[in-house]
Amino acid sequence: MAAPVVAPPGVVVSRANKRSGAGPGGSGGGGARGAEEEPPPPLQAVLVADSFDRRFFPISKDQPRVLLPLANVALIDYTLEFLTATGVQETFVFCCWKAAQIKEHLLKSKWCRPTSLNVVRIITSELYRSLGDVLRDVDAKALVRSDFLLVYGDVISNINITRALEEHRLRRKLEKNVSVMTMIFKESSPSHPTRCHEDNVVVAVDSTTNRVLHFQKTQGLRRFAFPLSLFQGSSDGVEVRYDLLDCHISICSPQVAQLFTDNFDYQTRDDFVRGLLVNEEILGNQIHMHVTAKEYGARVSNLHMYSAVCADVIRRWVYPLTPEANFTDSTTQSCTHSRHNIYRGPEVSLGHGSILEENVLLGSGTVIGSNCFITNSVIGPGCHIGDNVVLDQTYLWQGVRVAAGAQIHQSLLCDNAEVKERVTLKPRSVLTSQVVVGPNITLPEGSVISLHPPDAEEDEDDGEFSDDSGADQEKDKVKMKGYNPAEVGAAGKGYLWKAAGMNMEEEEELQQNLWGLKINMEEESESESEQSMDSEEPDSRGGSPQMDDIKVFQNEVLGTLQRGKEENISCDNLVLEINSLKYAYNISLKEVMQVLSHVVLEFPLQQMDSPLDSSRYCALLLPLLKAWSPVFRNYIKRAADHLEALAAIEDFFLEHEALGISMAKVLMAFYQLEILAEETILSWFSQRDTTDKGQQLRKNQQLQRFIQWLKEAEEESSEDD
């Protein structure tokens, strides 16, 4: 295909745009008009088929999260169907944990057929440890050529993002690529079942432009701290919203991948959003949001969300992604739909007297015994249910066997699990693959049974995302350690991971992992709430470090530039190091520019003796400015940035009056290197609210001649226009 050939030039252009805002049409007016008339490039997507956490352990020890069946369809198939329906023509699927299983599934699916409208490209690596690693690899491989969608492989959605994409592209066109991301949200009341507690956010947004001004995870907080500057700007109005569900769908510009490369401390999307909002002035980048009211979007981040989203699919809230649609074109997943949302696959057998009350999906080849009662449940293909069984809000995967007299409430049974006679599973129980429990036993609420011993987790830190991590050791432990009949029954096979009767710390871990956070607001103490609120304040805008931190930062920048000069380090790497120092010491952009300007302007003084000589100073400084000009251009973007840099330059020459006559040459160098613009230099020079020393500095003859030359050049340019 031609796409890989086009990719490198596209990336080069996007990097240039980050600085200048110039389009690919070049400087000619005809080229620009031609570029405007061209259709938008094919839409691409980056699908991250890994969560980089253990939220679904021990379930995901047997299969990756994106292959977990929801309403008998793998999660990743929902995500790919959403991307294809919304117009994506090329999707890069990044896999780490159990990548071989994901690759095998995709290669057998319709997504890898020659007729697929969405070309799926699978990229695997055991080195990915976060979303940040994935996006840095996207940038290194130059995979994206224009705006792209960023999603996880467990997103379920029917949102048509066409309007959001058009708004995103229009903003970037009008504001010269300032907006780098548009986040998709869905209106949803705080009590809605699909609201995931750990994903709850408070968002402050410009009501006119939908620009995100503040983004904060609530995490059970009762109070929130907002920077006062949010409400003091020139915006027409600011909305503070708590009625939004984060769909985990983002429209990204190519700059997003580049920003992850430039800021290696960004590991998650939240890191990225927080970094850009707290330090928005770094590159002048902005984040916007798009809110949908009627469409559906959610991420299956824990079993609470799994249950809620599965129920929504069965109740047809995600239309057209319904069970009978069979959008995967699989012969084993076809089914019929009847009243009360009863879905039956082929070759299903239902015994005499059994009742399917409502919202029930029966997979192909499933056999139901007599006098059973089933409601709000999903039963996978090839399952066998005995007589007199009660299933309420239960999810059975492929090949599960439930013997007579069993009662299962709000629980999950994975592939080939088996429940013996007269077993009761209390709510929020989980049996992972091939576990056997019973007979004649009641599992307490919150029980999690797995064939993997829980103590095998303690020694897995070094290889937590490796497919073979600890596999041999687990097998040895299984051989040495028998099953406890008190936990799993006389004929049971499995180990108890968590149970409601265990200590509070383990219960909290269960809630945070499999079923998600459960916040009891009344029990939260006032001091804890205030402490949590205060902990957010360092991320607020306007916070400045202590003076000694600035001094340390200045010394670190000086050391970085010295090494850069001695070792010939590229400017891109110098920017990376300065950015990491900026975050380490919580330095604002204004302070970065002040320190950078001060350090560079003082750099030649290390090689000079007193008294200072202007000619010698310029001879030493100008080559440094030329070499490090990309570093300056990385931070000096907007008019306000130019004025801050000019103020720092003025402060230096006020401090070193003996070098005052050099200022004109220095400003000329900044101008010729396209670091400072002529209009901002003229604006700075004409400032009237300066000190007496500042006014005296402006009377320097060389400086006045330079300013006069700039004015004449500006007038000539205006006449030519």
Swiss-Prot record:
Stored InterPro entries: ARM-type_fold (IPR016024), eIF-2B_epsilon_N (IPR035543), eIF2B_epsilon (IPR051956), Nucleotide-diphossugar_trans (IPR029044), Trimer_LpxA-like_sf (IPR011004), W2_domain (IPR003307), W2_eIF2B_epsilon (IPR044123)
PROSITE patterns linked to this entry: W2
Cross-link Glycyl lysine isopeptide (Lys-Gly) (interchain with G-Cter in ubiquitin), where in sequence: K61, K103, K141, K217
Residues annotated with Phosphothreonine modification: T322
Localization: Cytoplasm, Cytosol
Record keywords: Acetylation, Cytoplasm, Disease variant, Initiation factor, Isopeptide bond, Leukodystrophy, Methylation, Phosphoprotein, Protein biosynthesis, Ubl conjugation
Mutation effect (R113H): In VWM5; with ovarian failure
Post-translational modification, as annotated: Phosphorylated at Ser-544 by DYRK2; this is required for subsequent phosphorylation by GSK3B. Phosphorylated on serine and threonine residues by GSK3B; phosphorylation inhibits its function.
Domain W2 stretches: 543-720
Biased composition range(s): Low complexity: 1-13
Positions of modified residues (Omega-N-methylarginine): R19
Presence of keyword Acetylation: yes
Biased composition, class Gly residues, residue ranges: 22-33
Residue positions where Phosphoserine is found in the record: S27, S130, S450, S466, S469, S532, S540, S544, S717
Residues bearing the modification N-acetylalanine: A2
Gene Ontology annotations for the cellular component aspect, listed alphabetically: cytoplasm; cytosol; eukaryotic translation initiation factor 2B complex; nucleus
Effect of R195H: In VWM5; Cree leukoencephalopathy type
Chain positions covered by the region annotation Disordered: 1-40, 444-483, 523-547
Gene Ontology MF: a single term: guanyl-nucleotide exchange factor activity
Activity regulation description: Activated by the chemical integrated stress response (ISR) inhibitor ISRIB which stimulates guanine nucleotide exchange factor activity for both phosphorylated and unphosphorylated eIF2.
Acidic residues composition bias: residue spans: 456-471, 523-537
Family the UniProt entry places it in: Belongs to the eIF-2B gamma/epsilon subunits family.
Task performed by this protein: Acts as a component of the translation initiation factor 2B (eIF2B) complex, which catalyzes the exchange of GDP for GTP on eukaryotic initiation factor 2 (eIF2) gamma subunit. Its guanine nucleotide exchange factor activity is repressed when bound to eIF2 complex phosphorylated on the alpha subunit, thereby limiting the amount of methionyl-initiator methionine tRNA available to the ribosome and consequently global translation is repressed.
Subunit details: Component of the translation initiation factor 2B (eIF2B) complex which is a heterodecamer of two sets of five different subunits: alpha, beta, gamma, delta and epsilon. Subunits alpha, beta and delta comprise a regulatory subcomplex and subunits epsilon and gamma comprise a catalytic subcomplex. Within the complex, the hexameric regulatory complex resides at the center, with the two heterodimeric catalytic subcomplexes bound on opposite sides.
Protein name, as recorded: Translation initiation factor eIF2B subunit epsilon
Source organism (scientific name): Homo sapiens
Gene: EIF2B5
